[in-house]
């Protein structure tokens, strides 16, 4: 398959801003395909250290997104450092908090590429649930917890379990 990288003019969003928006669109697309709505946190309104909320019929799951081209999930896990403020906020949340690491190529032009009959996302993502009882300054995101359609079923079960329900 021949692919064409995107030619990208500099229209103002720096690479970190692009990573933030891309990770949100990655998860938004997955949720849309599964028939779920999401509530993205408006830029500069991230006062609870939550980037998006996944809306299940019964309740919600909160998600903190990280996007990296450096953490490539080459090993069995990747470490993500946590701010004390995030830990404090997530520990008070009544809803489950999931941390998602979206991995993208180092060259931004290859995050999405065009082929003759498709657009391909060159990204993959992994997740871990934040343990509210721990006070660690980092989390290990396991390679085994790849974000797929089944991840949403797992999260749904965790959300329901918090209210005494089951899937």
Predicted regions and their residues:
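Mixed-charge (Asp/Glu-Lys/Arg
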Residues: 1-48, 53-167
């Amino acid at each position: 398959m021949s692919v064409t990288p995107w030619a990208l003019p500099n229209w103002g969003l720096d690479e970190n801003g692009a990573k933030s928006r891309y990770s949100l669109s990655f998860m938004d697309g997955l949720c849309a395909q599964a028939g779920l709505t999401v509530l993205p946190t408006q830029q500069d309104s991230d006062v609870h250290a939550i980037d998006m909320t996944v809306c299940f019929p019964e309740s919600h799951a909160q998600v903190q997104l990280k996007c990296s081209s450096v953490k490539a999930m080459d090993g069995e896990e990747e470490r993500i450092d946590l701010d004390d403020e995030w830990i404090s906020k997530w520990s008070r949340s009544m809803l489950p908090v999931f941390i998602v690491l979206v991995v993208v190529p180092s060259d931004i032009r290859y995050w999405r590429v065009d082929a003759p009959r498709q657009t391909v996302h060159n990204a993959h993502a992994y997740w871990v649930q934040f343990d509210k009882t721990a006070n660690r300054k980092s989390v290990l995101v396991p390679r085994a917890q790849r974000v797929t359609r089944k991840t949403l079923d797992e999260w749904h079960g965790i959300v329901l379990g918090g209210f005494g329900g089951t899937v």
